[in-house]
Structures are given as C-alpha cells and as structure tokens.
Regions:
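Solvent-exposed, amphipathic alpha-helical segments
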Residues: 16-27
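Structured, amphipathic secondary-structure segments that form assembly/contact surfaces
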Residues: 1-11, 25, 30-144
C-alpha cells in the first residue's frame, strides 16, 4: 500500500490520535513505566524522545513520583484535522484537540485545560503495525 494512502478512515484516525496522544497523561506513580512504554510504542523514536525529554525537563515525572499522583485525561471536544500533507512520499496529518487532565492524591487534586497538537506520519514499519506513528506532540495550556 502506498504511504500516501489512508490506512484508516478519518473518524478512526482522529480516535487513534486522541487515544495515543493523551495516553502519557493517563498515568499513575506506580505503573508509569509500563504505561509510558505502551504509549511510546505509538510514537516515532524522535517523537517519543522529544516528548519524554520535555516531560522530564518540566518536572512532570518527578512530581508524579514524589506526590504519588494518579492522573487521568479526556478530550473535551472532538479532534480536528488541521493539515494533511505529503512529506517525503508519506502522508502527514496535524490533528488538534483540547483535553482536560486531572491529577490527584490523598491530599490534593489539580485540573488543567490543555491543547494537544499532534503530528502523525503514515509509516511502513514493523514497530508500528497500525501504519501510523506520532512524530510530534505539543501540549500547551489552553482554554475552550
């Protein structure tokens, strides 16, 4: 199959994007290594390394462990395709959606509104049997 051919319909693509973009935000202090590995399997090596570096540099990992947090995320509106291009004979999609993340422990609860911009590449790689991989995830503070 050509790497410019869709591997999923648009609804399935948007669902895939939301599921794997917010997966690293649905974590807890005890199971985060397994949860992060599962999420990372749906990213390119560059995409995951960039995300992980940012996550650690911002202190999110230390905060998760030290405060023994349970974090969960869910979209607050439907995802939309912001761009669809062909880069080096591979389809590339830029998808955006708002989501809310709540982190809590026995003493506190913190909720934040976030905006995810996800760049997804169509790939042909045994490590990505679904034919897609997240090349970049940018999450910023956002309001609806």
């Amino acid at each position: 199959m050509a790497l410019t051919s869709p591997v999923l319909g648009q609804d399935q693509l948007l669902g895939w994007a939301v599921k794997w973009a917010i997966a690293p935000y649905n974590i807890n202090y005890r199971d985060f290594p397994t949860q992060m590995n599962t999420a990372g399997a749906h990213y390119t090596l560059n995409g995951w390394n960039t995300f992980a570096k940012s996550f650690i540099t911002q202190g999110n990992l230390a905060k998760l462990r030290d405060a023994k947090l349970l974090c969960y995320a869910q979209p607050t509106r439907a995802a939309t395709v912001r761009a669809e291009t062909v880069v080096q004979r591979h389809s590339r999609y830029v998808i955006q959606f708002p989501f809310i993340q709540t982190c809590e422990n026995v003493n506190q609860q913190n909720t934040q509104m976030l905006m995810a911009t996800v760049t997804i590449d169509r790939v042909e790689d045994l490590d990505h049997p679904d034919g897609l991989a997240i090349e970049q995830l940018v999450v910023s503070s956002g309001r609806e």
